[in-house]
Amino acid sequence: MGRLRVLLLWLAWWLSQAGIAHGAGSVRLAGGLTLGGLFPVHARGAAGRACGTLKKEQGVHRLEAMLYALDRINADPELLPGVRLGARLLDTCSRDTYALEQALSFVQALIRGRGDGEEASVRCPGGVPPLRAAPPERVVAVVGASASSVSIMVANVLRLFAIPQISYASTAPELSDSTRYDFFSRVVPPDSYQAQAMVDIVRALGWNYVSTLASEGNYGESGVEAFVQISREAGGVCIAQSIKIPREPKPGEFHKVIRRLMETPNARGIIIFANEDDIRRVLEATRQANLTGHFLWVGSDSWGSKISPILNLEEEAVGAITILPKRASIDGFDQYFMTRSLENNRRNIWFAEFWEENFNCKLTSSGGQSDDSTRKCTGEERIGQDSTYEQEGKVQFVIDAVYAIAHALHSMHQALCPGHTGLCPAMEPTDGRTLLHYIRAVRFNGSAGTPVMFNENGDAPGRYDIFQYQATNGSASSGGYQAVGQWAEALRLDMEALQWSGDPHEVPPSQCSLPCGPGERKKMVKGVPCCWHCEACDGYRFQVDEFTCEACPGHMRPTPNHTGCRPTPVVRLTWSSPWAALPLLLAVLGIMATTTIIATFMRHNDTPIVRASGRELSYVLLTGIFLIYAITFLMVAEPCAAVCASRRLLLGLGTTLSYSALLTKTNRIYRIFEQGKRSVTPPPFISPTSQLVITFGLTSLQVVGVIAWLGAQPPHSVIDYEEQRTVDPEQARGVLKCDMSDLSLIGCLGYSLLLMVTCTVYAIKARGVPETFNEAKPIGFTMYTTCIIWLAFVPIFFGTAQSAEKIYIQTTTLTVSLSLSASVSLGMLYVPKTYVILFHPEQNVQKRKRSLKKTSTMAAPPKSENSEDAK
């Protein structure tokens, strides 16, 4: 620090001797206390030149605002009475290094004061003292600079000499560091507030994926850094790309910027912290890339509500949202500035250049001639009448900065020079540290009526106006900036006032991923919290929240859009169902036929045909057939405890009763035939009573088993939601049924199927019985056909176990198979007999008796007769 200070002292002394930045390069006002001023009167020069073109608004307007403020303060008898404020106003040429050279002139008086002892000992040859230049003004405080990079460079010098500095435009967050920039203050809020406001705007617009664009330097880079940091802490906003525009951009640099931005086309929102020149060239590159309307700009206060960055580029700027520290147009300055002329404003050395630029004319200087191609200035032109005029946005803050110093000096004067008019010895010279204390303590209403104050870091409170550039009647060139909101610690954005290309009131998206539709969840991309893939909540899952899918409960299915669950419809086989038509038809016809046959047999109970068929077992068999047909109605009926109990009992009872009777009858025929081969003694248990006992004994096993089942597992109805849980939830149904599984159902029929197989075996064995045993072959054909029916039933029944129509197919298959097996028995064994009884009664007579001996001569000697076995 010591070496740097010595170096700066030497450099400042050399500049003072050389006369640099003194005289023609500055605006000077005499006064008891001198304020310094730094303004970007000219743009940065190119090709090695320090300064470029004149900046009418940012430069001249702001400089004149300081002169206007000084005039008002010096004319105010209540503020600093007896003290006149002077000024030394310099041009920074928008370059930090050049501004540093200029700012060194502010410390010349301090250097001279400290070097007087040394200079007194210096003598020229002959003892003549050296010639001295006029002593420079002692600058007590500095207003400026504009760009943050310039303010940082200057602040590093001014703090060494304890000269307070107040900026009217520098907003870099870096300048809030009071340990490094302890003599720096500003009447504009730092970019940390601005960045917070921009984050709030982005979130209010529903954007979560944006890119940032910054001019190289403290302002742009610090602003973007603050935005990124705040957005990261707030969450919900991701940065697609952060692009920096070089301080000295090469040809094609801005086309490269646009190409990089298009690498993430979904990030349409562009947060731009850039100077006016860079903003303009970015818009030009956008037009040349034919991307007008694609990017959605959110500009910082360097864009604000200025026309110059978007002049002739209005189409590209339509929809841009910009931010500007809350300000108001100062009417008094407008009146002051619009009355400035070449005659009454000779103190501003750059005003003639402004005049030529503003009126597009040329002044004739002494010894020269005006350019023939340019109109000659008359000097009678009027600002605002012969040229366009709009007050520059930072004029208010320049005035407030000057007044802040004046109020601080006034408070300091009252404290150090009580009752004294003019400066007192306590303020000569003015101590910079003491003045800084009073600056930080000021609080007054500024030129726009808003409070001016500083916090402990020298920052002003954050208050911003939010604008949007909007087309007028569809024309961008005739559009303008419209106020759409404010920010003061919280955002107030009028969404209805916003206008966009396309649908004027629909905010264009700037999102990494489009919002997921109903019934879809976000599957986040690792490492990019704002990007996701949409994954459908398919099957029986529904969307719980934007990140989660869950399965619906077993008794429910998802809504069509999978945003919730709804009860699964319950179905059953109804009487009106097409699936029930055929089983019911067969059952009705079967019951009618069975009833007719039973009635016929009972009416002709003592006729030879009825007697020969074995009346007792025939009635048992017909009863079983009747029950088989009747079970169809129980299978179609609505399931309940009583129906389910009846199904268990009757499902196997009818078939067991039928096949027990057929087995008993077939076994009797087989035993009689086999016994006849060996002897004439009849086999045991062939009487009708024995046959009934055997039949009911076989049937009782089924009854006992079912009763035990009913006791162990009481019947009840259930709703099975798995049976018709199809791939498509819309087709899912809950099935109301009895609590009988497929295996339970087969188990219920298993015993009767065993009897059927056994009966078939005996029928095969008895196939060689003589024709006198006339029922052997019909029974055989009955059993063969029945076996075929049940063999077909098994694959159909179990092959449809996974079908959505399972309840219908299986019930229909079972009932039809039962009815067909019953119909085969009825048709093979009793229809022919009934036909003879009803239509050929002449054949229902007892034929000649054949003795058992006669009948069995083919196998063994006769021993007895049995009229029941012959027709």
UniProtKB/Swiss-Prot annotation:
It is found in: Cell membrane; Endoplasmic reticulum membrane; Golgi apparatus membrane; Cell projection, Dendrite. L-glutamate binds at residues 148, 169-171, 219, 301, 394. The chain crosses the membrane at residues 580-602, 617-637, 649-667, 692-712, 743-764, 778-800, 814-839. The keyword Kinase does not apply. Disruption phenotype: Retinal cells from mutant mice display a subtly altered response to cycles of light and darkness, due to a failure of the ON bipolar cells in the retina to become depolarized in response to light. As a consequence, mutant mice display little or no pupillary contraction in adaptation to low light intensity. Besides, they exhibit strongly impaired responses to moving stimuli, and fail to produce a response when the visual constrast is low. Besides, rod bipolar cells from mutant mice lack TRPM1 channel activity. Residues 603-616, 668-691, 765-777, 840-871 are cytoplasmic. InterPro entries: ANF_lig-bd_rcpt, GPCR_3, GPCR_3_9-Cys_dom, GPCR_3_9-Cys_sf, GPCR_3__mGluR6, GPCR_3_C, GPCR_3_CS, GPCR_3_mtglu_rcpt. G-protein coupled receptor for glutamate. Ligand binding causes a conformation change that triggers signaling via guanine nucleotide-binding proteins (G proteins) and modulates the activity of down-stream effectors, such as adenylate cyclase. Signaling inhibits adenylate cyclase activity. Signaling stimulates TRPM1 channel activity and Ca(2+) uptake. Required for normal vision. Belongs to the G-protein coupled receptor 3 family. This is Metabotropic glutamate receptor 6. It comes from Mus musculus (Mouse). The gene is Grm6.
